[in-house]
């Protein structure tokens, strides 16, 4: 009798474990909210984000002493234009124009916050008065989109003024061709500083139509050339892992792409360079430029890492060796468009395992706290997936 009871209990335990495992498998196979309703995720995350923008239009980086950057303002403007949120767009634009225009041009100071004396202003002692060409270009594009979205000519006129000064202050003509530099400060040394993630490939055909006096398509050509060389050349390593670097320099005499001249800037693939993947993918989505898909197909390391580990890290040296063991939601989101074009199966896996879980359908917000940068870039990844990043210049 005891033997029969023992066997019965053993069978019951096995059956219970089987049922638990089966339920776990069912749960794993069950689609997540972000997989079923991707458009709702994009809309709800924007509502949650814009609710945290100050009433006067200032975006905050709460993890860095509540600073504001021209980059952060540009992201808010782009997102507001895509989400057809004119009220938020106008608030953010007003604050940006009032507080970040501190020079004799139409470009924007990149860093604003509280100085050592407790005063809130552009942080000049930290180089905050300088411009950043990525933010300036994104703001110009957002203004063009606002003009097309809401049919107010003032937006277009400001965009044209910004484009004129980008060309005057942030672009240099070398051997008869235009090259985009990282900012108005980038020509201070014998070699010029370039950040490849500042190349707005998708925007240049639009800028060419709005500002035909300047050779924006020529800039697109040199930007792809610089990016391809920066990616494939060893730079300061023995070999290249075929990843875009965060920073490089260009020799104005030979046009050779070389390691950055500043010690605090590296050739790693990290929190700057991942944006290249998103920007190039958007160029393909909007313009079907063959250079975009050719470049994405040339990228190494990330696909291999995912196939081996179903993950990849947030920083790789230029030779492709991992520099950390940390993962990043921002970088997964920025890389998602790349995978969606060159390996849809990996894109599907990445979206489910690394992105979809970041959304809490009950809270209609992120499932865990993310910093300002991640909140924006995860949204850009979600929006690319949901096809909520249209070229608004095509609006009639």
Give the predicted meaning of each segment:
Residues 13-21:
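Hydrophobic membrane-insertion alpha-helices, especially the h-region
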Residues 320-396:
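C-terminal functional modules
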Residues 93, 143, 156-159, 163, ...:
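Inward-facing hydrophobic residues that define packing positions of alpha-helical scaffold repeats
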Residues 49, 83, 96-99, 103, ...:
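Alpha-helical solenoid scaffolds that mediate protein-protein interactions
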Residues 2-12:
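Bacterial N-terminal signal peptides that target proteins for export
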Residues 28-44, 66-70, 105, 109, ...:
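Extended ligand-binding clefts on enzyme/binding-domain cores
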Residues 72-88, 95-98, 138-152, 199-212, ...:
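Well-ordered alpha-helical scaffold segments within catalytic/enzyme domains
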Residues 36-136, 379, 383-386:
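N-terminal carbohydrate-binding/catalytic regions of secreted carbohydrate-active enzymes
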């Amino acid at each position: 009798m005891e033997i029969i009871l023992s066997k019965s209990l053993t069978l019951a335990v096995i059956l219970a474990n089987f049922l638990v495992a089966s339920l776990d498998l069912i749960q794993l196979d069950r689609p997540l909210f972000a997989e079923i309703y991707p458009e709702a995720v994009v809309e709800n995350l924007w509502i949650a984000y814009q609710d945290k923008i100050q009433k006067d239009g200032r975006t905050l980086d709460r993890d860095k002493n509540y600073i504001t950057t021209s980059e952060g303002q540009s992201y808010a403007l782009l997102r507001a234009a895509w989400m057809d949120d004119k009220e938020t767009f106008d608030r953010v634009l007003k604050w940006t124009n009032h507080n970040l225009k501190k020079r004799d041009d139409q470009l924007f100071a990149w860093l604003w916050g509280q100085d050592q004396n407790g005063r809130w202003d552009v942080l000049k002692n930290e180089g905050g008065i300088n411009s950043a060409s990525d933010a300036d270009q994104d703001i110009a594009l957002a203004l063009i989109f606002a003009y097309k979205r809401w049919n107010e000519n003032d937006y277009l006129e400001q965009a044209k003024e910004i484009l004129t000064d980008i060309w005057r202050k942030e672009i240099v003509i070398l051997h008869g061709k235009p090259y985009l530099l990282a900012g108005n400060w980038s020509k201070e040394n014998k070699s010029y500083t370039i950040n490849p993630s500042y190349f707005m490939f998708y925007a240049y055909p639009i800028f060419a139509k709005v500002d035909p006096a300047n050779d924006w398509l020529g800039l697109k050509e040199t930007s792809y050339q610089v990016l391809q060389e920066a990616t494939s050349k060893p730079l300061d390593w023995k070999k290249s892992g075929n990843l875009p670097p965060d920073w490089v320099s260009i020799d104005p005499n030979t046009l050779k792409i070389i390691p950055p001249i500043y010690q605090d800037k590296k050739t790693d693939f990290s929190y700057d360079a991942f944006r290249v993947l998103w920007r190039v993918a958007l160029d393909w989505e909007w313009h079907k430029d063959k250079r975009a898909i050719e470049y994405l197909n040339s990228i190494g390391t990330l696909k291999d890492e995912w196939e081996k580990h179903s993950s990849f890290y947030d920083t790789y040296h230029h030779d492709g060796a991992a520099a950390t063991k940390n993962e990043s939601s921002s970088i997964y989101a920025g890389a998602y468009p790349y995978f969606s074009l060159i390996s849809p199966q990996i894109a599907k896996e990445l979206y489910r395992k690394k992105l979809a879980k970041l959304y809490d359908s009950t809270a209609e917000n992120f499932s865990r706290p993310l910093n300002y940068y991640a909140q924006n870039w995860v949204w850009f990844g979600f929006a690319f997936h949901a096809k909520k990043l249209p070229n608004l210049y095509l609006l009639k």
